[in-house]
Amino acid sequence: MGTLKAVANPRASRRAFFGVAALVFVASAALTVAGCVSMQTMSELPMPGGWSMSMTWAPMCGQKWPRVAATFVGMWMVMMVAMMLPSLAPVLWRYHEAMGEAGSMRAGRMTALAGVGYFSVWAVLGVIVFVLGVALMSLALRVPSMARAVPIAAACVVLLAGILQFSRWKSRYLACGRMLTATHSASKAWTGGMRLGVHCILCCAGLTAVLLVNGTMDLRAMACVTLAITAERLAPFPDRIVRVTGAIVVVKGLWMLLQAS
């Protein structure tokens, strides 16, 4: 009886863990879709060079910059939860199991702290992306020659992102992004999650750049990047997935370069 109970508890804990993860994923995905649909109803500003600037980077009538920034970072975080959780959940579960007390409340708290630490790093990245995006768009509005160069610059970014997939940088941080050291210290759980978040950001730098170039509110781009990130983390042969993704992104970059020129 004791053995059956020991087996049943981890199974019940596993179901509960992935059930909660699935609910969080569905909620964040639904909010992301709603946000994208809302943004798509807003007109874009035509720019020299044949592209259009999204209103994501500009305040609407009566809005103040702090509110614009808070809205962007909020949408960014909801989007990142939806995109990263499918590949993060197995890592967090292994961390939960490694605590040696899979059914305990303490293991759950440590796992939650690690997850919050992980996404806090993505929140900081969201702030950086917003500041850089506003600065670049403001410069493009003031300097027409720079606005005309944006399509070529975007194509080069995508091309470099594809090449990055074949680098040792990618292999190194892809391996680091699968590990989270178990600890019974709340502060170390938080910092461990943050460290994992940094590794994931560095690992996904190229794919994140592709997403930003194609539009942060583009559902198709989000879906493709999410599938690529999840596949390269969970597939039995991640190196093959990384190379295939890299080849696709390189072709995309060359096509964009051809169109821009």
Question: In which residue ranges do the predicted regions lie?
Answer:
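Juxtamembrane transmembrane-helix termini in multi-pass membrane transport proteins
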Residues: 2-9, 72-119
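Residues within membrane-spanning alpha-helices of integral membrane proteins
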Residues: 18-25, 151-158, 162, 222, ...
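Generic transmembrane alpha-helix signature in multi-pass membrane proteins
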Residues: 78, 90, 94, 192-198, ...
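A small-residue-rich subset of transmembrane alpha-helices
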Residues: 104-135, 203-252
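Transmembrane alpha-helix/helix-exit interface in multi-pass inner-membrane proteins
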Residues: 123-138, 142-143, 150-177
